[in-house]
Each structure stands twice: as C-alpha cells, then as structure tokens.
Amino acid sequence: SRPPAKLDFIDHVVGNQPDGEMESVAKWYETILQFHRFWSVDDKQVHTEYSALRSIVMSNWEENIKLPINEPAPGKKKSQIEEYVEYYGGAGVQHIALNTQDIIKSVQNLQSRGVEFLQVPDSYYDILRQQLKLSKVKVSEDLDILQKLKILIDYDENGYLLQIFTKNMQ
C-alpha cells in the first residue's frame, strides 16, 4: 500500500480572472455565498518592474475558506495572470495550496505516489544559505534535505514558510 499524503487541509484556492472581472466575481461570492473581503491589494502593492496584479481574498465568516481572486494590472510585459487567462481561454483556478504539519514527509510520500514537483536550481539554495546567515530567522529543518526535495523557503523577520509546487496538472 502507498504511504499517506499527510495533508491536513486546503489552505486556499486562487482564481485568476481577466482584467476588469475581479470585482464582479468578488461581488458574486458576497451575494451568493455570503463571503466577505478578508484582504485586498492593488497594483501599487503587488508589482515588479514588468508586471502587476490586483487581488481580493474572499473568505467565509468562519475564515476557514479563503479564495484569492486575482486580475492583471497594466505593466511593461504580460503578467502571469494574463498569460494564464490567454492560455486557458478564460478564468480558472491557478493553484490550490494544501497545508501539512510535515512537508518533508508529505513530499516524500507524494513522490512515492508519482507526484512530480517543479525543479529548483541548486544556486537557489546556495544564495539562500548566504542570505540566511545574515538573517535572524533560523530554519529548523535540514537545508540539505530541503534542497534534495526542492522545497522552497519564503521568509521575513517574522518567520518562514516552506512550500513546493507540483508540475502543472490539467
């Protein structure tokens, strides 16, 4: 028998919308499902030199269901949201985030079940090790194991988050 995936719950489900449709989708969640705006950002808050996005996170009143809704904002190049909408011919689910208490075991078990994850270059971990030396954040997991499994570390002064992405599924 296969080992359990060891996934605890769905953290969030991200939906990408064409430009100009985010507000009407958010309104639908408010009106039909009685969700509320948990959080929102505009293109001044989420942007790079080349692209930007707007986002509204909708949640039920218990706040155990979170649905970020994204739409592109003008930029020098196409955003990942514009590319998604064009590629798939419209709105849809960009990703589903799953929570686990033991990402290392979950990734190992999912790999044994045939799940394929995105590759991360070793240079990412070389740079990360140097940056972590200068940070107050102390990662308790073994960096060599995280590197072997291609688990990413996102951190700031308040702590860190471990994450990994599967290859695209259709």
What are these regions (language model features)?
Residues 42:
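Active-site and NAD+-binding cores of ADP-ribose-processing enzymes
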Residues 1-38, 47-170:
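Glyoxalase I/VOC metalloenzyme domain signal
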